[in-house]
Amino acid sequence: FFPGIKEVLFQLKNAGFRVALVADGLVESFDNIYQQHEMETYFEVRAISETVGVCKPAGEMFKTAMEKMNLEEADKKYIIMIGNNLERDIVGANRMGITSVLAGYSPRYRMKPENEEETPDYVVCDPSEIPALIEMLDKQMENKK
């Protein structure tokens, strides 16, 4: 996890936002990371590719998290995917009709979209920007109700 992420997750949880981990990899790897960083309580649910049987950008990854959170199709407009991989996270969210946010601070993957499907709705350059963005999006949704 990136520096500052644990604090962001803490802020989001305390503000009443529900957080899911939708990730490609092995369950054991994420268990180790959770324990190492004492993050077991920050995610309400996890949809990990080893368990789901597919990797992002497959919609099944996102649908699994939604089902575990008892969310329906109509709830997608309230869901935000924050990810560092254009091809998997952003494409997957965009295909599902979920608001996509690129974690532009990640050096792990390329940050320049090559097509419209890879273009995120928003980009954050530092984890500390995430709570304010989510609060802004939440207020926009409240105004649309």
State the predicted function of each range:
Residues 2-3:
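Active-site core of PLP-dependent enzymes with the aminotransferase class I/II
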Residues 6, 10-13, 17-145:
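Asp-based, Mg2+/Mn2+-dependent phosphohydrolase catalytic module
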